[in-house]
């Protein structure tokens, strides 16, 4: 199990790279994260949801994403509450305190999923969440040491030297852990080093001396990480590309921002995620309103930031606007939530750029989907993950044929479009045509680029980590009889 000294130390990337490295060694590998918190969900073939990081790790391992790879997914809806997804299915919304009390039942689900994976594969790479040093969260924990103890697995602790203080991170974690948890950690590694590795030899040795743990490597910064699907939206914002400018307002409950990954990978495209407090730039080729875990709440947030004024001005200047899922709903005339599916019951006015109306009702739709463009008959693959149904005159100008039905809406001037289909930009031919309509060319093979980068990441870890030492730490897991 790979645990970190904090959030965003690179655990997900390490698991993806190690999964590809071990697969290249001929091992059957599966990724596993008992509990994840993310609104960036992936859809599995059976209509379940898991964290998108685990979907990338599954790809690295040569597997289709499966709900057992992330049995508990928390999708924040407010600062103190989240939708709880258990083994792919929505179990309801829980306040933080209620979730803490319900963890005992969730541990059973995580162990059940883990044991299924362990029975099917040579090795399971487990990713922790946050840090085991959060001692106030240890009771009832299912994300780090609580799971490691219940499953009987050894732990590799990873620190991040990029943010500074990595010696204190690792030694401090050693200090605050209970002796039984400390004993589970068998080794440490340092991630995201920049510069001459030999300069940290003394620091590495000091950590080993103070903790008694051996080092499995000091891993240099992997410069091509931006070519892989991002787990954090700011990883996308940090990469600047070409002249085609795609501007994205950073919604408070932004969801499924993986829609931006293929655009960010385009040499001709710069994706700019605009944080709160800043106006949307006036020189955008496209304003893309992304998905949201709280559409009505994020529409109010968008207005509070003044972005509604910026979007309408962009459209008046002749600019293009695309709304996906929640963003599509925001572009319409109104959103009606009679049952309080998205929050408090009520009806709100939309941005009015599409002549459509949304009603938040019915079952949640979670499915992988295959479509074709109505203009040009180009193949488009993606997924749907939404509540609500959208209808209205602009739906008569749908732009996708999705499994026998028309999907999406287009404004009368052709410059505003919306759809419930996430992931459509991973389809190279569609993305190239979309960018061509904006006046920019593309010949990028997105999937080939992701595969090549995973191979490069695996080689990077083989060079700088003691992968043999990691394999020696692995222990057989007794799988309970069903």
Curated annotation (Swiss-Prot):
Q: Which domain of life is it from?
A: Bacteria
Q: What is this protein called?
A: Cobyric acid synthase
Q: Which gene encodes it?
A: cobQ
Q: Which NCBIfam families match?
A: cobQ, PRK00784.1
Q: Where is the GATase cobBQ-type domain?
A: 243-430
Family note: Belongs to the CobB/CobQ family. CobQ subfamily.
Q: From its record, what is one biological process in GO terms? A: cobalamin biosynthetic process
Cite the GO molecular-function annotations of the record.
ABC-type vitamin B12 transporter activity; catalytic activity
Give the range the annotation lists for the signal sequence: none
Source organism per entry reads Ruegeria sp. (strain TM1040) (Silicibacter sp.)
Lineage of the organism? Bacteria, Pseudomonadati, Pseudomonadota, Alphaproteobacteria, Rhodobacterales
The protein's UniProt keywords, in alphabetical order, are: Cobalamin biosynthesis, Glutamine amidotransferase
Q: Which Pfam family is one of this chain's hits? A: CbiA
InterPro entries hit by this protein: Class_I_gatase-like, CobQ/CobB/MinD/ParA_Nub-bd_dom, CobQ_GATase1, CobQ_N, CobQ_synth, GATase_3, P-loop_NTPase
